[in-house]
Regions:
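Short, hinge-like loop/turn segments at secondary-structure boundaries
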Residues: 21-22, 46-52, 122-124
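Conserved beta-loop-beta/alpha segment of the NTase-like Rossmann-fold superfamily
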Residues: 1-43, 62
């Protein structure tokens, strides 16, 4: 198995990693994720809401994203051979598109945030300073 993790997520915990290891053994592909708490709107090019998806079906994807080694390697081989790589935003999408993989959502933690904006970095610093079970 291979774990793909985003270095901008320093608050990943042992519990998240262990849950992903458990799920990849059963499902061959899994991603750390949490249920969406906010209402999400689909908008048009003018910023006008055109649809409100059912929140109960939406998950916020994190890392690690974990795959059987051969599965993700074959998926990436197919990606590199394809002329149309548009719309790929994460490793799970590569596996879904090129291997038709059913990716398991592994329940993660809301503290496993991606620190990409100044606000994210402040929140991450708070989580890391709390002396919680955050792994580095």
């Amino acid at each position: 198995n291979i774990f793909i993790h985003d270095g901008a997520r320093p608050c990943v915990t042992d519990n998240i990693i262990n849950a992903c290891m458990r799920d990849v053994m059963q499902y061959k592909a899994c991603v750390a994720a949490v249920p969406v708490k906010d209402t999400i709107k689909v908008v048009d090019t003018d910023g006008i809401a055109v649809n409100t998806p059912d929140r109960s079906t939406l998950w916020q994807i994190q890392t690690p994203q974990v795959f059987e080694y051969g599965l993700i390697m074959e998926a990436y081989d197919r990606l590199y051979a394809d002329n149309d790589k548009s719309g790929i935003t994460d490793d799970a999408m590569v596996s879904e598109r090129y291997m038709h993989t059913k990716v398991k959502m592994t329940l993660s933690e809301y503290t496993n945030i991606k620190a990409t904006t100044p606000e994210d970095i402040l929140v991450t610093q708070i989580f890391l300073s709390q002396n919680t079970k955050v792994s580095m």
